[in-house]
Amino acid sequence: VQDEEEKLYIYAQTMDGRTRYGIVACAHSEDYMNGIIKKHELTRKDKEDDRMIHVNITNANVEPVFFAYPAHKEIDQMVDNIVKNEKPIYDFVAKEDGFGHTFWVIEDEATIKRIEEIFEKEIPALYVADGHHRTAAAARVGQERRAGNPNHNGNEEYNYFMAVIFPDNQLKIIDYNRVVKDLNGLSEEEFLAKLNDTFVVEKVGTEIYKPSKLHEFSMY
């Protein structure tokens, strides 16, 4: 369902008893190319290419990327006021994982303009929390379509992609776990010896161990 007028939206995600509130908006590909939208992962070209094909075929952003921004008191207050006083347009719990999803429309033009002004003048950067390949692909699609449009002015829809932007004080960094199912023909001792070629491997006991510093990993 497409609104007749441009709006911003508030998205609340509830999981494990915690709720975080983000703003659904469009991000500009130039902000990514110019480093205002900051990444912390290297991306693979084949994955970017795959996502570009999807965007070009559907001509849509079907899933928002997840950005974080330094929390801003005035934005927090505006979001809180809408959440407490306005009726959400959608409110449901997903059967698959039990997560709650709630959406509000920001209708007031003055509020929309003020939020845009704060992000333009007072928020120095956005940070990609999830969606590095989708962000890179969206920026590349914008560049390609710009190159093919002699009348490009920067306001075309292909310059933008959908994002949900959460304040950093509502985020929780959780474990990023991966399972090694196959040692590729190596014994456990040989596998650990191979790791020693690149890492310093130390035994730390039999209890759960969480990394405590940069470039440290735990393995079981």
Question: Regions from the language model: what does each represent?
Answer:
Residues V1-Y220:
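Surface-exposed, charge/polar-rich loops and edge strands
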